[in-house]
Amino acid sequence: MPIRVIAKNKKAYFDYEILQSLESGIVLQGSEVKSIRAGRVNLKDSFIKIIRGEAFLFNAHISFLQTTYTHFKPNERRERKLLLHKKEIDKLFGSVSKESLSIVPLNIYFNQKNKIKLCIALVRGKKLHDKRESIKKKMLEREARAHMKSYGKKL
């Protein structure tokens, strides 16, 4: 349960149908934690791979913060290990290999204990007509909200 969401992967909600989501920890360096606290993280185009029984986050961009230690500059797009139980990793790996599904991060947030957590999801790619359908649905909801708002003002 997120307390404060730092970054959302909006592209994942549009491109994929979310089947199952779960919470995982993430292994970070000190400067990366400071950058995340400052909100300098981007999850767009990031994905999760399971390698040798361990889950890794690839292509997540955590910007370097200039106020941190300057002699060591970490790679901003390095792979980061995810902290999951073995059963969860096995379940995800089975789903990915059998059903040709993917694992993507949805958002990064602070939990109640002020720890940085990553919400990951097992997803299936949407077809083009599904994407168009979701765009139409969003537009209709937006128009209905605007119409209700203007109707409320007239009363």
From Swiss-Prot:
* CDD domains, sorted: SmpB (cd09294)
Localization (cell): Cytoplasm
Q: Does the keyword Metal-binding apply?
A: no
The UniProt transmembrane annotation reads none
**Can you list the GO cellular component terms from the UniProt entry?**
cytosol
Please name the Gene3D superfamilies in this protein's record.
Answer: 2.40.280.10
Q: Which GO terms describe its biological process?
A: trans-translation
Give the UniProt keywords, A-Z. Cytoplasm, RNA-binding
Under Gene Ontology molecular function, one entry of this record is: RNA binding
In the record, the note on similarity to other proteins reads: Belongs to the SmpB family.
What is known about what this protein does? Required for rescue of stalled ribosomes mediated by trans-translation. Binds to transfer-messenger RNA (tmRNA), required for stable association of tmRNA with ribosomes. tmRNA and SmpB together mimic tRNA shape, replacing the anticodon stem-loop with SmpB. tmRNA is encoded by the ssrA gene; the 2 termini fold to resemble tRNA(Ala) and it encodes a 'tag peptide', a short internal open reading frame. During trans-translation Ala-aminoacylated tmRNA acts like a tRNA, entering the A-site of stalled ribosomes, displacing the stalled mRNA.
NCBIfam families with a match to the protein in the record? PRK05422.1, smpB
Task: Tell me the protein's name.
Answer: SsrA-binding protein
Gene name in the database record: smpB
